[in-house]
Amino acid sequence: MARGLAVFFLLAGACLALAEDVVDKGVAKARVESCSGUQLNRYPGAKQFIQEDLPLFHNTKFQHIGGAAPELLLLNKQDQELERFDLKKLSREEINELMIKKGFYKKSSKDEQVPEEYQEGPYMEKEEL
């Protein structure tokens, strides 16, 4: 009985390990989470990025979370979180550079068409800008 139980837990552990490996690790979209009021006002670089630059990036969105400090979440196609970045100490330029380094396309205007290679992820990280 004890041996059968040990085998069961061993197999269950192996299945869980395999399930974790199935997660798609390709960055396909990004979400910035933050409050849109007083908390965000403390971080002018993040506030400017969210208001002026985020709408120009393809496959990105803003999610209001009351009282939350600004964070960038990189997600796969299933909306699973792959990476999280604290934006509090970053300037607007640094956040833009981070997005571009992570492979996201920034349009020069809202009307600009997104090139074919940027339509869908996964996006590849760039070594140099």
UniProtKB/Swiss-Prot annotation:
Organism: Eriocheir sinensis
Active site per UniProt: 35, 38
Main location: endoplasmic reticulum
Family listed: Belongs to the selenoprotein M/F family.
Residues in the signal sequence: 1-19
PANTHER family recorded: SELENOPROTEIN F, SELENOPROTEIN M
Expressing tissues: High expression levels observed in hepatopancreas, testis, ovaries and intestine. Also expressed in heart, stomach, gills, cranial ganglia, muscle and hematocytes.
Cell compartment(s), UniProt: Endoplasmic reticulum
Record region (Disordered): 107-129
Stored InterPro entries: Sep15/SelM_sf (IPR038219), Sep15_SelM (IPR039992), Sep15_SelM_dom (IPR014912), Thioredoxin-like_sf (IPR036249)
Disulfide links within the chain: none
Descriptive protein name: Selenoprotein M
PROSITE patterns, sorted: ER_TARGET
